[in-house]
Regions:
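Bacterial lipoprotein signal-peptidase II cleavage site
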Residues: 20-35, 41
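Beta-alpha junction/loop-to-helix N-cap segments that form part of ligand/metal-binding clefts
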Residues: 76-83, 95-165, 174, 231-238
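Extracellular/periplasmic bilobed ligand-binding domains
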Residues: 211-305
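Extracellular/periplasmic periplasmic-binding protein-like sensory domains
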Residues: 269-342, 353-358, 408-431
Length: 432
């Protein structure tokens, strides 16, 4: 009965975030203070073999890993996801923890380096004996970690939209898959008269796979590809590419650049005299946090596709935004991956309570069908592929760095990571 009451309360806990944030300074040993989060706990914790399991539990605490890029080119995006995950942990701890245990976060820096992500994931599972890990941003980091989680039977909660064509039994995907972001974004552009596409992305798996999908979609729906370019993460000179874009005269640049390359691209685009009135860009890795880093004056009028904005109108989001700002500062913003990281912690906690166990296999089994009243709206874990149902939203960046929603899907969209429901995508993957 006690567990049932906790589960019922979990779905509405986000609505109490303001109160919890206000008392956060008085919540003693919750292990989630930002200052404490930068270093791992003492290595004196007992070491035993095996993956995330009851060995993660010590006394009155259960250890979880948080693994994001806190340095390097991806830090512009990932630091704030870490912060939202720590906020969720603090809130859950203030409510009594999970199965009566306080959550103890162990934070590691992936340093925008994919082998480092794999190394740190192995450390968290094998040495720290964490029950689960919340982490990653780029698909390169996720794919580096994936074999480690599968080998050691660990559990990763990955909070960022990605290219699909994957469904690991050891990963829960709380960001959008392709049919919840990229495919509807292309449809939206085509339906609004944008037929000629220029594809610009960072040179790694997410942009490459996303653009492969987009090209098939354009062929099937009467669009036209007029250019395609890739640059390394951290690339800063876009003058040549901007000249190529001007020569190609596209209706839209579909932008899959990631990290601080977006700062250089949009500043140089404006320096070339090109504004959103001259050329539409639609980005899938720029949200409010990136707008804050780039400068909204460079982004005003450009489009984005996500599942959540700080302006999303739900009671849960109002509370989430207020709590996040109360903890981290009034100048901070929320954004889609920030919210997805926050939601991931709550979904894991709900699955643990439903399972009555921290063991990975039991948590995975219990997670299927769990619903949560998230800041973005209702989300549900799809037991078939461990992705979540999400509402699609197309938005326009405003002068203050916020995003005005222009369109949404009306209801949460079932995740289809292999695009099995799209005839034109039949040749893209043999995934099932």
């Amino acid at each position: 009965m006690k567990r049932r009451k906790w589960l019922n309360g979990l779905a509405t806990l986000a609505a109490a975030c303001l109160v919890l944030a206000a008392c956060g300074g008085n919540s003693g040993n919750n292990g989630a203070s930002p200052s404490a989060s930068e270093s791992s706990p003492s290595a004196s914790a007992p070491s035993s073999s095996g993956s995330a399991s009851p060995s993660a539990i010590g006394g009155d605490t259960v250890k979880v890993g948080i693994l994001h890029s806190l340095s390097g080119t991806m830090a512009i995006s990932e630091v704030s996801v870490r912060d939202s995950e720590l906020l969720a942990i603090e809130e859950i701890n203030a409510k009594g923890g999970v199965l009566g245990k306080q959550i103890e976060p162990i934070v590691e820096d992936g340093a925008s380096d994919w082998p480092t992500f794999a190394e740190k994931a192995r450390k968290l599972i094998s040495e720290d004996k964490v029950a689960t890990v919340f982490g990653g941003w780029t698909s390169a980091s996720r794919k580096a970690m994936l074999p480690v989680f599968e080998e050691l039977n660990g559990l990763l909660w990955y909070p960022v939209q990605y290219e699909g064509m994957e469904s690991s039994p050891n990963i829960f995907y709380t960001g959008a898959t392709t049919n919840q972001q990229i495919v509807p974004a292309v449809d939206y552009l085509l339906e609004n008269g944008k037929k000629k596409f220029y594809l610009l992305g960072s040179d790694y798996v997410f942009p490459q796979t996303a653009n492969k999908i987009i090209k098939e979609q354009l062929k099937a729906k009467g669009g036209e590809l007029v250019g395609e370019e890739y640059t390394q993460l951290g690339h800063t000179d876009y003058s040549t590419i901007i000249a190529k874009i001007q020569a190609a005269q596209p209706d839209v640049v579909f932008n899959t650049l990631n990290g601080d390359s977006n700062v250089a691209f949009f500043k140089q685009l404006k320096d070339a005299g090109i504004t959103s009135a001259d050329l539409t860009t639609l980005s899938v890795s720029i949200a409010e946090e990136e707008a804050r880093g780039i400068g909204p004056e460079y982004l005003e009028g450009h489009l984005v596709a996500w599942n959540y904005y700080q302006t999303t109108d739900t009671p849960e989001n109002k509370t989430f935004v207020e709590s996040y700002k109360a903890k981290y500062g009034a100048d901070r913003v929320t954004a889609d991956p920030i919210e997805a990281g926050y939601v991931a912690v709550y979904l894991w906690a709900a699955a643990v309570e439903k399972a009555g166990s921290f063991e990975v296999d039991k948590v995975k089994e219990a997670a299927a069908g769990i619903e949560f009243a998230a800041p973005e709206g209702k989300v549900t874990i799809d037991g078939e592929n461990q992705h979540i149902y999400k509402t699609v939203r197309i938005g326009e960046l405003q002068a203050d760095g916020q995003i005005k929603e222009l369109w949404n899907s009306g209801e949460p969209v079932k995740p289809d990571p292999y695009l099995k429901t799209y005839d034109w995508a039949a040749g893209l993957s043999s995934g099932s």
